[in-house]
């Protein structure tokens, strides 16, 4: 399967979902590290709808995994595994939400302002130009999305390891545009949070204190609707905890402890 990376040895009971949407390969260092102790899958999301990506994940789990599985999701991937756990609770042991976007719209309104305020005038102008391009319904420009992600990386991270620059991410602008448009509307309408009431498994959210996505936008809404929910805030940490110089060790300690419970 071209859209699947495997780490460690079977049985595969841990799966790591990447962000973006459409940023395949972004969690490879995380999946590889976790795979040193267990079988881990890193699937690439290829479908252009939220439901399509959920079903694609189900097919991967049913074909390659030994349910029940532990699902980790980063950024958009956190929403994906959350939605998956709500629909297919019988397949899931627990989920770990890493650097999730906020679950209610009012928490999301200030994210871009935080990012822009961390940039210089030239970079800020370029981000605004790229945002206009990314809103184009005909967009198929991987280079524009890649440049946008690099500029966001300047604002989203606290102190990244040098290795972060060498992570190969396969950008798909069409997936980003299509899936994010649908997912953000789910948040705006309240459907995203409401769906989580169907989750029956334990949920752990891990978040960096420097991440422009506000931690309270994850902790507060999920605390209201989930029966078994824990939240851990990492200090001096941005949007990619496993690549953060100061938070990496604590991040892996938290995640490994949670995986050992599964």
Q: Which sequence ranges carry the predicted segments?
A:
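Conserved hydrolase catalytic core segment
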Residues: 68-111
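Short beta-strand/loop motif that positions the catalytic acidic residue
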Residues: 199, 205-207
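Conserved HGGG/HGGXW glycine-rich cap/lid loop of the alpha/beta-hydrolase fold
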Residues: 2-50
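Flexible "cap/lid" loop of the alpha/beta hydrolase fold
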Residues: 96-133
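Catalytic histidine-centered segment of alpha/beta-hydrolase-like enzymes
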Residues: 237-248
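Conserved alpha/beta-hydrolase "acid-adjacent" motif
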Residues: 212-218
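Alpha/beta-hydrolase
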Residues: 128-194, 201
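Active-site loop/oxyanion-hole signature of alpha/beta-hydrolase fold enzymes
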Residues: 41-76, 87, 251
């Amino acid at each position: 399967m071209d859209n699947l990376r495997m780490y460690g040895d079977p049985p595969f009971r841990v799966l790591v979902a990447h962000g973006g949407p459409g940023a395949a390969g972004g969690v490879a260092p995380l999946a590889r590290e976790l795979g040193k102790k267990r079988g881990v899958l890193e699937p690439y999301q290829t479908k252009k709808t939220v439901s399509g990506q959920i079903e694609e994940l189900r097919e991967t789990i049913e074909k390659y995994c030994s349910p029940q599985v532990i699902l980790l999701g980063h950024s958009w991937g956190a929403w994906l595994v959350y939605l998956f756990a709500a629909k297919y609770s019988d397949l899931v042991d627990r989920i770990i939400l890493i650097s999730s976007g906020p679950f209610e719209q009012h928490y999301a309104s200030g994210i871009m302002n935080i990012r822009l305020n961390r940039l210089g005038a030239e970079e800020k102008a370029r981000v605004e130009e790229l945002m206009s391009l990314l809103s184009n319904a005909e967009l198929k420009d991987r280079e524009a999305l890649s440049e946008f992600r690099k500029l966001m990386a300047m604002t989203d991270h606290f102190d990244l390891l040098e290795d972060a620059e060498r992570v190969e991410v396969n950008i798909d602008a069409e997936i980003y545009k299509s899936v994010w448009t649908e997912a953000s509307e789910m948040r705006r309408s309240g459907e995203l949070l409401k769906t989580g009431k169907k989750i029956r498994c334990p949920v752990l959210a891990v978040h960096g204190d420097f991440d422009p996505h506000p931690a309270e936008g994850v902790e507060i809404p999920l605390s209201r609707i989930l029966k078994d929910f824990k939240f851990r805030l990492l200090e001096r940490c941005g949007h990619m905890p496993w690549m953060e110089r100061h938070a990496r060790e604590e991040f892996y300690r938290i995640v490994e402890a949670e995986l050992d419970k599964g």
